[in-house]
Amino acid sequence: MGQVEKARQGQFARPHHSDSQRRVRAWSRIQRRARSF
């Protein structure tokens, strides 16, 4: 079971991580616009 869990994490870890980075970058852009105003 442990190996299966690790395999699942390996498959979903990268896409989820990239998606989280996209959200953070988009949010940072919104904050920058708010600060500029």
UniProtKB/Swiss-Prot annotation:
Residues 23-37 have a biased composition (Basic residues). It comes from the Viruses. This is Uncharacterized immunity region protein 4. It comes from Bacillus phage phi105. Residues 1-37 are annotated as: Disordered.
